[in-house]
Amino acid sequence: MARVKRGVTTHARHKKVLEQSKGFRGRSSTNYRIALERLEKALRYAYRDRRNKKRDFRALWIQRINAAVREHGLTYSKFIFGLDKAGIEIDRKVLAAIAFDDAATFAEIVKKAQAALAA
């Protein structure tokens, strides 16, 4: 059986890691051992933050809706409860966009929520 030397696969693996770590600072982009550690850490951060991004955006939408609703004399909690009672099913992302871009339309939505709360 022929002897297998693994230089080709090692070189390919090193090249792959160094290409992925391109742009890292210092020896993190040129030294394989350091680059591998930094790349693994970067991938862990990326995985974690893809999940955190969803939480962060939801919190941002809620803050924007709350700020817009308080101008109309309601709290966020009561507004969402009013929307539910009124049967209006608009998600927070769209509500935040409407509040941010189109104040008149948002005011109408708030009026409907207030009417449902009063009833």
Swiss-Prot record:
GO cellular component, one term: ribosome
A Gene Ontology BP annotation from the UniProt entry: ribosomal large subunit assembly
GO MF terms held by the record: rRNA binding; structural constituent of ribosome
Keyword Transferase: no
Protein name: Large ribosomal subunit protein bL20
CDD domains: Ribosomal_L20
Natural source organism: Gluconacetobacter diazotrophicus (strain ATCC 49037 / DSM 5601 / CCUG 37298 / CIP 103539 / LMG 7603 / PAl5)
Pfam families cross-referenced by the UniProt entry: Ribosomal_L20 (PF00453)
Coiled coil: none
Superkingdom field: Bacteria
Alphabetical keyword list: Ribonucleoprotein, Ribosomal protein, RNA-binding, rRNA-binding
NCBIfam families: rplT_bact
Function field: Binds directly to 23S ribosomal RNA and is necessary for the in vitro assembly process of the 50S ribosomal subunit. It is not involved in the protein synthesizing functions of that subunit.
Family to which the UniProt record says this protein belongs: Belongs to the bacterial ribosomal protein bL20 family.
InterPro entries: Ribosomal_bL20, RIBOSOMAL_L20_CS, Ribosomal_protein_bL20_C
